[in-house]
């Protein structure tokens, strides 16, 4: 069999087919996500809109949509796309075309990431749905603000967002090192709140 692992900047060797929580480091995740572009890089601005930046927005939207939700589930929202630090961010039509193989890889990596940071390997269905709802609102904002969709087209594909939910939010484009630091800092805040 060919090599199925990747050497991470932390020095860890992550087996992509059989990942273990011991091989997951937040610095590797933050670095990878800060350099992975959403929308295949087809966005306006001087910097690609990164998966790390998107994840920060999803966590904020999730918290706004679910007042009083615990930090544990906010951490899950922040990490909702964590496997993309090694798999990359494929747009939805490509994921659908690839099918089951991609889903299985994503599920294995997700479980390892969750276990590494004290979350259940598989999230409860209501939490998963609530995170997906925040993810969809984020995609809607991104589509219109930076990905070239008209308002009507974005509404048709992603739905019209609740104006109260998105009030004051704007898509941020930052250099990868800056968003990497922001993602890592947010992760540390959420993780610290879980440990008391």
Curated annotation (Swiss-Prot):
PROSITE patterns: HD. Gene3D superfamilies: Hypothetical protein af1432 (1.10.3210.10). InterPro entries: HD/PDEase_dom, HD_domain. It comes from the Bacteria. Pfam families: HD. Residues 51-164 form the HD domain. This is Uncharacterized protein RCAP_rcc00048. It comes from Rhodobacter capsulatus (strain ATCC BAA-309 / NBRC 16581 / SB1003).
